[in-house]
Amino acid sequence: MDSNTTSSFQVDCFLWHVRKRFADQEMGDAPFLDRIRRDQKSLKGRSITLGIDIEAATRAGKLIIERILDEESDEALKMNIASVPASRYVTDMTPEEMSRDWFMLVPKQKFAGPLCIRMDQAILDKNIILKANFSVAFDRLETLILLRAFTSEGATVGEISQLPSLPGHTSEDVKNAIGILIGGLEWNDNTVRVSETLQRFAWGSSNENGRPPFAPKQERKMAGTVESEV
């Protein structure tokens, strides 16, 4: 096994341990806690693949980090921090909108990579807006925390969330999932808009009609796959 692969796993295990200790003191925000959950799944999978015990790897990772910190000057640390863009958390939804319970009369569930799409196909002829809470880096969507679809009356009728068993996703995964959700809701003659904030950070632009600039391939997929499965 490549020594770099082993040492990388050891360092990741120790850094996860530090972040978990921080979170246990109730000081982590939503994106921070979400990354801990996703990374835990990833580390367990890597442990099985590499055949390395996580506890032993964590101890070895601690020694590696301690050695690096002993050699690190304050000036080098400042330069490294300055060169890394900080993620920020963007909220379309209120805490109440994000946490409220909702149910589906005619449930429909689909998957787009590591994302789960749920929608109520009993909803007809409604004006619907998609809102999301997510983290941003380099002015682009980095990690989707939760996306929900709301009618103009405020009812929750759809959702996109991460699958705990498949941690990690890309902005393309998010855009594909949004396309599937829009296609499913529009099949029942609903009018769907995407919030300007989500458009701006996921697609880099926003349209007044609330329709993101989907690629032709995505448009065909939205129209075709949903029709055949509903």
From Swiss-Prot:
Gene3D superfamilies: Influenza virus non-structural protein, effector domain, S15/NS1, RNA-binding. Residues 180-215 are annotated as: CPSF4-binding. Residues 1-73 are annotated as: RNA-binding and homodimerization. InterPro entries: NS1 (IPR004208), NS1A (IPR000256), NS1A_effect_dom-like_sf (IPR038064), uS15_NS1_RNA-bd_sf (IPR009068). Its main location: host cell. A motif (Nuclear export signal) lies at residues 137-146. GO terms for molecular function: protein serine/threonine kinase inhibitor activity; RNA binding. The keyword Transmembrane helix does not apply. Residues 223-230 are annotated as: PABPN1-binding. Inhibits post-transcriptional processing of cellular pre-mRNA, by binding and inhibiting two cellular proteins that are required for the 3'-end processing of cellular pre-mRNAs: the 30 kDa cleavage and polyadenylation specificity factor/CPSF4 and the poly(A)-binding protein 2/PABPN1. In turn, unprocessed 3' end pre-mRNAs accumulate in the host nucleus and are no longer exported to the cytoplasm. Cellular protein synthesis is thereby shut off very early after virus infection. Homodimer. Interacts with host TRIM25 (via coiled coil); this interaction specifically inhibits TRIM25 multimerization and TRIM25-mediated RIGI CARD ubiquitination. Interacts with human EIF2AK2/PKR, CPSF4, IVNS1ABP and PABPN1. This is Non-structural protein 1. It comes from Influenza A virus (strain A/Gull/Minnesota/945/1980 H13N6). The gene is NS.
